[in-house]
């Protein structure tokens, strides 16, 4: 009769050697077994290594001064805003550095940032440059396209999808990225009094943004659009995502002025009408944002508020010429590819800046002004071998004269005669 051999029949964990009677569970693989105790141990090791990897990503975190230096390469002026952003971003990623498997006595909370300033003052460029400096995923969203759940428009989760896409669907990277939400002032409540009518693009959106600003595990539809039953979702933790909220907040200077009792600090009372809007923004307080239409809970999620100044002629001229990717440098390089030298006179730069101020477009409108003046030249030059140099004057910018064209010997060239 066949005799049962217990020693041969008992299954053992291939890692620790314990048999099936000594553990709660054995999981079978291809010729191997692993017990529940080894599974738990492996899980702990993986979690610790992942946490260590997350902190190592920012071991070379630049200091606030180094961040400021990088911002100076691309953004002219706005020193106060750049300093506030540099410190805020440094503290944010330093906070991520200290996160790990061990519990800390003091929990450092996230500090999102609000940038308040007129159109074309550099809000978006600041956020973009920060992300580039830190080499983290970056996404831009427009608050005006958002509506609260259940209404036509974008859900707030679609903002997170853009960040996930920017990180090539690497969730770990996305969870340490930066999201810039523009036009945040456009979702302000229409008045301080709660209305009985629905404000689906105002207070409702603020309420929807609250959780992702503070930190939550959000369910994001991988294809975007509205959520629906039986749909698969991407899970992303927003706790370590830095949100930078930007807006022009037109008219908030009047709100501040009313709070200050029609008297601007640092100015004589009879000069109240001649106040500097930028000086007023320096005195902005949370109650001003609430009076403008942001709900208190939303304001509480953006403890850092930096104001950007209106750009004057001198600042706009510097923007045209000084940054690494300055517009004048770009257009010079563009014509250089056609073996043509491009020159802007000092008066031309002043005229460009003046026109941008007149149009109230700030730095954002500089490119279109230059493009208007160069479009004909950029059309003709590739077909002409005579032009070696183009000079743009203030008369060119003001549409009073054509650009001055010269050949290699310095003689003036008339393209109309040449083509004839």
UniProtKB/Swiss-Prot annotation:
Keywords: ATP-binding, Chaperone, Metal-binding, Nucleotide-binding, Zinc
InterPro entries noted in UniProt: AAA+_ATPase (IPR003593), ATP-dep_Clp_protease_ClpX (IPR050052), ATPase_AAA_core (IPR003959), Clp_ATPase_C (IPR019489), Clp_protease_ATP-bd_su_ClpX (IPR004487), ClpX_bact (IPR046425), P-loop_NTPase (IPR027417), Znf_CppX_C4 (IPR010603)
Biological-process GO terms, alphabetical: cell division; proteolysis involved in protein catabolic process
GO terms, molecular function: ATP binding; ATP hydrolysis activity; ATP-dependent protein folding chaperone; protein dimerization activity; unfolded protein binding; zinc ion binding
Keyword Nucleotide-binding: yes
Binding site for ATP: 118-125
Binding site for Zn(2+): 13, 16, 35, 38
Coiled-coil regions listed: none
Assembly notes: Component of the ClpX-ClpP complex. Forms a hexameric ring that, in the presence of ATP, binds to fourteen ClpP subunits assembled into a disk-like structure with a central cavity, resembling the structure of eukaryotic proteasomes.
General function of this protein: ATP-dependent specificity component of the Clp protease. It directs the protease to specific substrates. Can perform chaperone functions in the absence of ClpP.
Record-stated family: Belongs to the ClpX chaperone family.
Full protein name: ATP-dependent Clp protease ATP-binding subunit ClpX
């Amino acid at each position: 009769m066949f005799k049962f051999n217990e020693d041969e029949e008992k299954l053992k964990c291939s890692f620790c050697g314990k048999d099936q009677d000594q553990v709660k569970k054995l999981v079978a693989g291809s010729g191997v077994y692993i017990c529940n105790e080894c599974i738990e141990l492996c899980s702990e090791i993986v979690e610790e290594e992942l946490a260590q990897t997350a902190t190592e990503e920012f071991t070379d975190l630049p200091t606030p001064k180094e961040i400021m230096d990088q911002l100076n390469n691309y953004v002219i002026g706005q020193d106060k805003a750049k300093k506030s952003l540099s410190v805020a971003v440094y503290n944010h990623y330093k906070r991520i550095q200290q996160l790990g498997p061990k519990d800390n006595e003091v929990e450092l909370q996230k500090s999102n940032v609000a940038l308040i300033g007129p159109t074309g003052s550099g809000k978006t460029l600041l956020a973009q440059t920060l992300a580039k400096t830190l080499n983290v995923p970056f996404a831009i969203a427009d608050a005006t396209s958002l509506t609260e759940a259940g209404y036509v428009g974008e859900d707030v989760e679609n903002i997170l999808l853009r960040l996930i896409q920017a990180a090539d669907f690497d969730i770990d990277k996305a969870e340490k990225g930066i999201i810039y939400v523009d036009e945040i002032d456009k979702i302000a409540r229409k008045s301080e009094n709660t209305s009985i009518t629905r404000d689906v693009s105002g207070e409702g959106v603020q309420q929807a943004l609250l959780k992702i600003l503070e930190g939550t595990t959000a369910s994001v539809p991988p294809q975007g659009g509205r959520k629906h039953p039986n749909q698969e979702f991407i899970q992303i933790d927003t706790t370590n995502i830095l949100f930078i909220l930007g807006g022009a907040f037109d008219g908030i200077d009047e709100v501040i002025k009313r709070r200050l009792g029609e008297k601007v600090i640092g100015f004589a009372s009879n000069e109240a009408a001649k106040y500097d809007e930028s000086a007023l923004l320096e005195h902005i307080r949370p109650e001003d944002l609430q009076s403008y239409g942001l709900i208190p809970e939303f304001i509480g999620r953006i403890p850092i508020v930096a104001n950007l100044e209106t750009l004057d002629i001198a600042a706009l001229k510097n923007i045209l010429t000084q940054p690494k990717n300055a517009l004048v440098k770009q257009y010079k390089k563009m014509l250089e590819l056609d073996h043509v030298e491009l020159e802007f006179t000092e008066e031309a730069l002043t005229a460009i800046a003046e026109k941008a101020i007149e149009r109230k477009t700030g730095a954002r409108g500089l490119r279109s002004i230059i493009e208007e003046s160069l479009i004909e030249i950029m059309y003709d030059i590739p077909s002409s071998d005579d032009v070696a140099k183009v000079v743009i004057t203030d008369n060119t910018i003001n549409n009073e004269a054509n650009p001055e064209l010269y050949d290699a010997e310095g003689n003036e060239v008339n393209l109309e005669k040449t083509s004839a």
